[in-house]
């Protein structure tokens, strides 16, 4: 009789996943469990050998479902991450300031799903996000000021499903499926 693979091995949380180097190359972030829930950790890179894992700190404090999607802002000062509530897939976009550890909900809308559309290092204080505020099936593009948190409608969605932005954070193309799904 072959031993079964334990469920924890197949479905449990990984030890570490999604490593991301900061834009300045001086910090490493990754997702790992904290008190049994996946959160984002950050460690300084202090030597040529790599990050000082003993100095790692948890920068998010999720106690429920865990965090799976995150990224650095281009100013090296903050991390962005997506989080839903109870598996509803209405993702909110949050940031955490790595100096103050202050967290902000950048898309505080009930029943709305946020998606990061584009960011660019030439615009470290801005990103484009898709929000389905007006129609649950369509994500309009908003420009988000990462300093003030202000959202400005950039491009309304006329019935497309995706966007392509250039390096100037200007939406240049849209993606729409064919009637046959192709």
How would you label these PLM feature ranges?
Residues 23-24, 74-75, 121-123, 167-168:
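Residue-level detector of Asp-centered blade-edge/turn motifs that repeat once per structural unit
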Residues 1-16, 43-68, 73, 86, ...:
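Multi-bladed beta-propeller domains
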Residues 8-41:
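Beta-strand-rich domains and repeat architectures in extracellular enzymes and scaffolds
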Residues 69, 113-124, 164, 170:
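A structural signal for short, hydrophobic beta-strand segments that form beta-sheets
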Residues 36-41, 88-94, 136-142, 180-182:
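Structural motif
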Residues 25-28, 77-80, 126-127, 172:
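Hydrophobic beta-strand positions that form the internal "hydrophobic ladder"
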Residues 167, 174-178, 182:
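Cationic-aromatic interfacial patches
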């Amino acid at each position: 009789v072959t031993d079964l693979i334990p469920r924890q091995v197949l479905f449990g949380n990984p030890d570490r996943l999604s490593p991301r180097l900061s834009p300045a190359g001086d910090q490493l972030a990754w997702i790992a469990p904290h008190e049994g829930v996946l959160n984002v950790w950050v460690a300084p890179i202090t030597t040529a050998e790599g990050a000082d894992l003993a100095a790692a700190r948890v920068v998010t404090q999720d106690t429920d479902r865990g965090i799976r999607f995150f990224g650095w802002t281009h100013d090296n000062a903050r991390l962005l991450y997506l989080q839903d509530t109870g598996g509803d897939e209405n993702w909110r976009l949050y940031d955490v300031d790595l100096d103050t550890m202050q967290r902000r909900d950048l898309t505080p809308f009930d029943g709305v799903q946020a998606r990061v559309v584009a960011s660019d290092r030439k615009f470290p204080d801005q990103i484009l996000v898709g929000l389905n505020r007006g129609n649950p099936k369509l994500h309009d593009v908003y420009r988000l000021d990462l300093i003030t948190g202000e959202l400005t409608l950039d491009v309304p969605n006329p019935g497309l499903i995706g966007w392509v932005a250039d390096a100037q954070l200007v939406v240049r193309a849209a993606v729409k499926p064919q009637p046959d799904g192709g």
